[in-house]
């Protein structure tokens, strides 16, 4: 209770009145208004009658209560995240209206300090929100937004031209939206150690003894004391603290949707075209005068800083197809990962890129002949039950394009040709396939041919080295017999005569 004296209150008595009211009334902090009220109370009252002094003291107390009520409604708890509004001054006896968060704070009188407790608390990281929404409400809102974005992306894909770059980008965007939606629907999946960032799918590594280098900060990853992740798509390795600093998307998406090589040998454009900055992280680089050394990538021809170019060595596809040069050259980290993912993809059509290569590299001619024979053997295996049960075609599962065409090559194929490995392995597979067709399987033997020109010799097959195949009817002949008869096919002549007889023979309606 406030102690009111009948005498003129001195400074200490006024201070006691203010302190009692402060203790009896909880508030959030001391502001300029409260300090002003305290200063007014501490001012000695003039002399006069006891009744007059009592009325003045009561009036001051009522005025203080009104100001304190307005102060409470004008300020929020400083531990809330959002700073509260302040109301306009109201006269005595007026009803205080509700204050909405949209109302602005009034300006304080000159000379009074600003009240900034909420901001200071937020800066210190001490703010709390005890009235936040449940996690499920945020999840439902995000799921609804993702579903709406997926539907809009579908509509955009249907409206864009077929096989256009914008349509491909929209398809990639749709895939990422679906993955994000699936992650939100299954937040408690069995793989909590996977993080998706910029098309990277990082998996938390469990190895503690293998020493690796972070691809972001270019420092050693100490597995015993540091957490690190590896991208399952491009094998990008980094510390857990460096995940949010990654700015380059995963190159596996580029391999999936734009699988092609740069076939110009070191297409340099100069540092001025890069604005004297790293082609990947945009850090300032130069050939001299700056701490970061400019390093050129032999694949892209661009310049990189020492953090993005570690002087890694790789075989350049353009030098292979044009010069048959397999010497490793220095490339950037991004090009290194891209070439590593592309090494087994058959995207090189050598006959169109460099047709003279088959004239100078004999191994390529042998490989092409073996691939053509395997394509001729494929129909036998598809229609043979024993071959399908034995899964003979799986002998080429590492090079699936060998059973699809004889024109496409991968960089790994050319590396194996240069090393002499591909010719030996392909010859063994060719021998195994021919043995099944000509010796082991009676059904495949029954599908052989007899030379209709000489009608002598063994059963012929289209993949035999001494045979020729008619381009029109696929009949097989001895090579010498076929060219001695001026490449005329008796089967084609017989089929043409049969067609003519069918057209010339009159029907029963014509004779009647």
UniProtKB/Swiss-Prot annotation:
Keyword Zinc (UniProt): yes
Keyword field contains Zinc-finger: yes
Phosphoserine: modified positions: 501
Biased composition (Acidic residues): 95-105
Pfam families on file: C1_1, RH_dom
GO molecular function, one term: zinc ion binding
SUPFAM superfamilies: Cysteine-rich domain (SSF57889)
Phorbol-ester/DAG-type zinc finger span: 199-250, 429-489
A Gene Ontology biological process term: positive regulation of bone resorption
Keywords: Acetylation, Metal-binding, Phosphoprotein, Repeat, Zinc, Zinc-finger
Subunit structure: Interacts (via C-terminus) with PLEKHM1; this interaction is weak but increased in a RAB7A-dependent manner.
Annotated function: Positively regulates lysosome peripheral distribution and ruffled border formation in osteoclasts. Involved in bone resorption.
Entry's family note: Belongs to the DEF8 family.
UniProt protein name: Differentially expressed in FDCP 8 homolog
Native source species: Homo sapiens
């Amino acid at each position: 209770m406030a102690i009111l004296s009948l005498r003129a209150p001195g400074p200490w008595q006024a201070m006691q009145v203010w302190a009692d009211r402060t203790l009896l009334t909880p508030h959030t902090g001391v502001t300029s208004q409260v300090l002003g009220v305290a200063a007014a109370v501490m001012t000695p009252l003039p002399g006069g009658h006891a009744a007059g002094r009592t009325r003045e003291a009561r009036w001051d107390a009522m005025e203080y209560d009104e100001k304190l009520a307005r102060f409470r409604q004008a300020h929020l708890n400083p531990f809330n995240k959002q700073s509260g509004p302040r109301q306009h001054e109201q006269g005595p006896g007026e009803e205080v209206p509700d204050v909405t968060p949209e109302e602005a704070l009034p300006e304080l009188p000159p000379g009074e300090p600003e009240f900034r407790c909420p901001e200071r608390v937020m800066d210190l990281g001490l703010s709390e929100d005890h009235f936040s929404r449940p996690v499920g409400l945020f999840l439902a809102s995000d799921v609804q937004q993702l579903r709406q974005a997926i539907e809009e992306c579908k509509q955009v894909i249907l409206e864009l031209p077929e096989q256009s770059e914008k349509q491909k980008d929209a398809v990639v965007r749709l895939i990422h939206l679906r993955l994000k939606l699936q992650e939100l629907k299954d937040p408690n999946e069995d793989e909590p150690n996977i993080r998706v960032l910029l098309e990277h799918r990082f998996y938390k590594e469990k190895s503690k003894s293998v020493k690796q280098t972070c691809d972001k900060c270019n420092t050693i990853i100490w597995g015993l004391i540091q957490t690190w992740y590896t991208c399952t798509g491009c094998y990008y390795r980094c510390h857990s603290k460096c995940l949010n600093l990654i700015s380059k998307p995963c190159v596996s998406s580029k391999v999936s949707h734009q699988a092609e090589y740069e076939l110009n040998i070191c297409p340099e454009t100069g540092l001025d075209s890069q604005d004297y900055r790293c082609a990947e992280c945009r850090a300032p680089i130069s050939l001299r005068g700056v701490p970061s050394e400019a390093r050129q990538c032999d694949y892209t021809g661009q310049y990189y800083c020492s953090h993005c170019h570690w002087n890694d060595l790789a075989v350049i596809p353009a030098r292979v197809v044009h010069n048959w040069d397999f010497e490793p050259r220095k490339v950037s980290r991004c090009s290194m990962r891209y070439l590593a993912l592309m090494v087994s993809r058959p995207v090189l059509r050598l006959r169109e890129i460099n047709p003279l290569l088959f004239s100078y590299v004999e191994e390529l001619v042998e490989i092409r002949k073996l691939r053509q024979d395997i394509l001729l053997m494929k129909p036998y295996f598809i229609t043979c039950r024993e071959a399908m049960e034995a899964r003979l075609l799986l002998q080429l599962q590492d090079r699936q394009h060998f059973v699809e065409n004889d024109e496409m090559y991968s960089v790994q194929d050319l590396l194996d040709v240069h090393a002499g490995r591909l010719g030996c392995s392909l010859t063994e597979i060719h021998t195994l396939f021919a043995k099944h067709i000509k010796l082991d399987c009676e059904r495949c033997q029954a599908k052989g041919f007899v030379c209709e020109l000489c009608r002598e010799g063994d059963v012929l097959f289209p993949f035999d080295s001494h045979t020729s195949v008619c381009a029109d009817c696929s009949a097989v002949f001895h090579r010498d017999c076929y060219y001695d008869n001026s490449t005329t096919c008796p089967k084609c002549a017989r089929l043409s005569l049969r067609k003519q007889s069918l057209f010339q023979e009159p029907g029963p309606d014509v004779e009647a």
